[in-house]
């Protein structure tokens, strides 16, 4: 599974598929945080894990929201859903959403229950911020441990 926050160019998508070689099962996703907020009847926001199908390969996923097990919403504002804008691959929407939800809880540098973005996007943004502060001419470290 490959996550991006920008749309796939046709040549880029072809390159990723070519790079797969013999790997048959793949999913390439474009994820965007939607600015629209949704409400549900009652006083709690939508449930974490709620999926709204917009099309066969386009859907909304609430990665933040009310968690019945804890009987609370671990956030401060009305949650915004994550929109799966593009989905190129073999998995069902349910499988993709389940995996994204799991990846929102995979930040070992935080004690939070989960985050709005999967670690694949969140960590890439974190490293990107660090790299923008590097002086010109310095070769960046390639090992993960330098960015924890």
What role is predicted for each listed range?
Residues 1-148:
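Long, contiguous domain-sized segments
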């Amino acid at each position: 599974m490959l996550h991006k926050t920008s749309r796939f160019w046709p040549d880029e998508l072809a390159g990723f598929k070519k790079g797969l070689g013999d790997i048959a099962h793949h999913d390439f996703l474009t994820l965007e945080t939607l600015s629209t907020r949704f409400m549900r009847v009652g006083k709690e926001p939508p449930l974490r894990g709620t999926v709204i199908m917009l099309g066969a390969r386009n859907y909304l996923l609430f990665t933040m929201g009310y968690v019945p097990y804890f009987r609370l919403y671990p956030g401060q504002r009305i949650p915004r859903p994550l929109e799966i804008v593009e989905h190129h691959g073999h998995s069902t929407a349910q499988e993709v959403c389940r995996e994204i939800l799991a990846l929102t809880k995979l930040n070992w540098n935080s004690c939070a229950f989960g985050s709005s973005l999967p670690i694949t996007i969140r960590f890439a943004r974190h490293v990107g911020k660090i790299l923008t502060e590097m002086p010109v001419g310095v070769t960046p470290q390639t090992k993960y441990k330098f960015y924890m």
